[in-house]
């Protein structure tokens, strides 16, 4: 299959370029805010709409700073230590979900500490929202022709312009489907059908567990980052970073259902 050559830049005004990647962040945050408000309206949890509105600034800073620093420190430290100014070039791409997640968690902790809010009550509201951003972000990765999969002989293998012109798994679409659509559906079903907000930490545990499982599995089809390659002969950085998420998620699920 031929890659649909879509310009990563939607439009430019002088030096200002609006990319699909940056737009995915903006739309993801807006849709997430809207969806979280709907959850609050229906279930009336400890978290209020005013709390959510106040948290947005914390979340944006935590996600962007954490995502960027995560990529810099975990995926390409030599380049950025040699050229520190490149750290600011976020328009070139280069964000780590695991770094963004950690940044968001730290931001949530600081926010909850300041406003004396239960930490897991906040993350349980945020958990069902995150797959929206994951879906849009992976679609943007696909449009950019980055983070593509390993070489395949399958009929749906796709030739990406930035690769070696060999057919590859469109792993960005696999991630958009499982980490985005499927995970969103699981959490929506849990939240609205099984009223999981009544059990503190359960939504957060479901998110971490299923994200970890999906990411570890899909990494089998994704090409390792060229500057890192395989770790311990067969593991990728994404798989290694997802194991703690899987363990944390399992713990949160267990502690939310004490015997």
Swiss-Prot record:
Annotated gene: lgt
Keywords: Cell inner membrane, Cell membrane, Membrane, Transferase, Transmembrane, Transmembrane helix
Statement: the UniProt record of this protein carries the keyword Zinc: no
EC nos: 2.5.1.145
Name this polypeptide is given: Phosphatidylglycerol--prolipoprotein diacylglyceryl transferase
InterPro entries: Lgt
Protein family (similarity comment): Belongs to the Lgt family.
Record's GO cellular component terms: plasma membrane
Chief location category: membrane
Coiled coil segments of this chain: none
Domain of life according to the entry: Bacteria
Statement: the UniProt record of this protein carries the keyword Transmembrane helix: yes
Membrane topology field: Multi-pass membrane protein
Subcellular localization: Cell inner membrane
UniProt-listed PANTHER family: PHOSPHATIDYLGLYCEROL--PROLIPOPROTEIN DIACYLGLYCERYL TRANSFERASE, PROLIPOPROTEIN DIACYLGLYCERYL TRANSFERASE
Organism: Rickettsia rickettsii (strain Sheila Smith)
Top enzyme category: transferase
């Amino acid at each position: 299959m031929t890659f649909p050559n879509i310009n990563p830049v939607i439009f430019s005004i002088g030096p200002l370029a609006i990319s699909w990647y940056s737009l995915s962040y903006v739309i993801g945050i807006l849709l997430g805010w809207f969806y979280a408000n709907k959850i609050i309206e229906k279930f009336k949890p400890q978290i209020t709409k005013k709390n959510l509105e106040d948290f947005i600034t914390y979340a944006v800073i935590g996600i962007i700073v954490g995502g960027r620093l995560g990529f810099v420190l975990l995926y390409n430290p030599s380049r950025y230590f040699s050229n520190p100014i490149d750290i600011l070039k976020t328009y070139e791409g280069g964000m780590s979900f695991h770094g963004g997640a950690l940044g968001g968690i730290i931001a949530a902790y600081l926010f909850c500490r300041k406003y004396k809010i239960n930490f897991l009550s906040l993350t349980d509201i945020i958990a069902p929202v995150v797959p929206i951003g994951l879906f849009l972000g992976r679609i943007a990765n696909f449009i950019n022709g980055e983070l593509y999969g390993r070489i395949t002989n399958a009929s749906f293998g796709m030739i990406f312009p930035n690769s070696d012109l060999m057919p590859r798994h469109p792993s960005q679409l696999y991630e958009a489907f499982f980490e985005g659509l499927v995970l969103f559906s699981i959490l929506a079903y849990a939240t609205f059908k099984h009223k999981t907000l009544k059990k503190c930490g359960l939504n957060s545990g479901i998110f971490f567990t299923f994200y970890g499982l999906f990411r570890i599995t899909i990494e089998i089809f994704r090409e390792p980052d060229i500057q890192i390659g395989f770790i311990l002969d067969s593991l990728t950085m994404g798989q290694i970073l997802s194991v703690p998420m899987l363990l944390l998620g399992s713990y949160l699920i267990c502690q939310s259902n004490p015997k």
